[in-house]
């Protein structure tokens, strides 16, 4: 009986050993064959066995191999590596993603983005709502913008934002929100000005009355600065300002030019759009950093301008010559504070009675001249005086095309009440192409642009 029991036990042991041997043979041969058939090398198969990944391998995974052989390998992130299968070694980036997102979150993201886009997420804050992020990606926004908008906009704001066509620069929307505009006002503004103008409003100032203005059927964006100025000057309501400005009631044919000097602001920002006029004064020590001499073929006499203004002028002058066979020249460019002071005093002396009010109607006091910026030019047509420019072929061409090169006619007709100067056909100002296009589109003066934009 004991012998029979011993035989039974031995049989069980042998059976178990046989099963174990079969499993071992399977693991060593058949399982390995499955992995090698997928393309893994014997060394890679050993690593897969080492981390017990056999049951999770369904295909050759280059990202896993990169990770297993990388000095950045982190065993706790093995299942993150398995989510990727890229020919690029993203091991370090995957490690960083594991610190931001759970496995389930990353799986969801990978249904929205490809590997390269997903790796880009390491450069941004964690996505606060993946479902909302997907809506933005579906609207063709970039990964960066989609993350920013998802994390910035509240749920209701995002839903309203998504009703807009895809914006060229969605940061304009968030910039306007940051300045204090509500979502409905921003959408109304977009509807009023259109996509092209809206894309240029990132430095648009905050005006508490804009929402009410946009609701007025007579509102005209081109008159916005004048509405606001009229409200400030007259203390009237939005509706009254729109009515009176639309009726041109703010127009003054012959303003008191000396009164422009009553409240003077010191200019500290000397960017391309710097406003220098009778109310905004440059320091007597200000000299532009990048002044260069205008080459002889493009000037009437020795003149200097800021480099960018020169380059734009040369292109404009060449194109004018090609179009109408007439050459535009710089008659006067940069003038120092001292030169402006001397010129103004000469005008006073020439007036006979020393009456500055007469001189203020056509000249600027020292520090108040745009010529000191190195961005303003008085022009003439070759072989003609600047005073005759209005009668020249090149004048018509320049007036029509100047904005394409970043220049604006600085003192247009019927705007002296804004600019402090009567119409001057030969005086142009460089502000850069984008700003010049906007000013041309809405028929603004630089004063109006400056009133509306930072």
Annotate each language-model stretch with its function.
Residues 25-333, 337-454:
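Extracytoplasmic cell-surface/polysaccharide-interacting catalytic and binding patches
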Residues 2-18:
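N-terminal Sec-pathway targeting helices
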Residues 17-25:
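Hydrophobic helical h-region of N-terminal Sec-dependent signal peptides
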């Amino acid at each position: 009986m004991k012998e029979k029991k011993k035989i039974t036990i031995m049989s069980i042991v042998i059976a178990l050993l046989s099963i174990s041997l079969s499993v071992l043979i399977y693991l060593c041969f058949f399982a390995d064959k499955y992995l090698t058939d997928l393309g893994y090398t014997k060394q890679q198969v050993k690593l897969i066995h080492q981390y017990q990944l056999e049951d999770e391998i369904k295909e050759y995974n280059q990202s896993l191999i990169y990770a297993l052989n990388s000095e950045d390998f982190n065993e706790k992130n093995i299942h993150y590596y398995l989510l990727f299968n890229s020919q690029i070694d993203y091991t370090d980036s995957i490690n960083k993603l594991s610190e931001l997102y759970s496995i389930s979150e990353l799986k969801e993201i990978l249904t929205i983005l490809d590997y390269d886009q997903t790796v880009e997420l390491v450069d941004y804050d964690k996505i606060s709502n993946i479902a909302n992020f997907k809506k933005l990606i579906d609207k063709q926004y970039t990964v960066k913008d989609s993350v920013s908008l998802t994390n910035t906009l509240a749920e209701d704001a995002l839903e309203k934002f998504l009703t807009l066509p895809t914006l060229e620069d969605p940061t304009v929307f968030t910039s306007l929100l940051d300045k204090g505009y509500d979502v409905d006002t921003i959408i109304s503004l977009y509807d009023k000005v259109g996509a092209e103008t809206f894309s240029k409003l990132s430095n648009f100032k905050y005006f508490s009355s804009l929402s009410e203005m946009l609701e007025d059927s007579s509102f005209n964006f081109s008159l916005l600065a004048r509405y606001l100025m009229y409200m400030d000057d007259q203390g009237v309501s939005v509706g009254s300002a729109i009515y009176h400005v639309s009726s041109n009631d703010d127009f003054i044919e012959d303003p008191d030019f000396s009164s422009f000097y009553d409240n003077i602001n010191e200019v500290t920002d000397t960017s391309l759009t710097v406003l220098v006029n009778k109310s905004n004064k440059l320091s007597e020590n200000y000299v532009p950093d990048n002044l260069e001499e205008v080459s002889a073929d493009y000037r009437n006499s020795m003149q200097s301008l800021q480099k960018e203004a020169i380059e734009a002028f040369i292109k404009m002058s060449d194109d004018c010559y090609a179009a109408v066979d007439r050459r535009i020249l710089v008659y006067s460019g940069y003038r120092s504070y001292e030169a402006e002071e001397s010129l103004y005093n000469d005008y006073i002396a020439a007036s006979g009675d020393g009456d500055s009010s007469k001189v203020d109607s056509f000249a600027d006091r020292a520090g108040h001249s745009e010529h000191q910026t190195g961005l303003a030019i008085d022009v003439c047509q070759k072989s003609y005086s600047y005073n005759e420019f209005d009668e020249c072929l090149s004048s018509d061409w320049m007036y029509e095309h100047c904005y394409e090169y970043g220049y604006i006619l600085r003192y247009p007709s019927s705007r002296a009440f804004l600019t402090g100067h009567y119409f001057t056909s030969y005086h142009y100002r460089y502000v850069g192409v984008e700003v010049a296009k906007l000013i041309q589109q809405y028929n603004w003066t630089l004063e109006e642009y400056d009133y509306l934009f930072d």
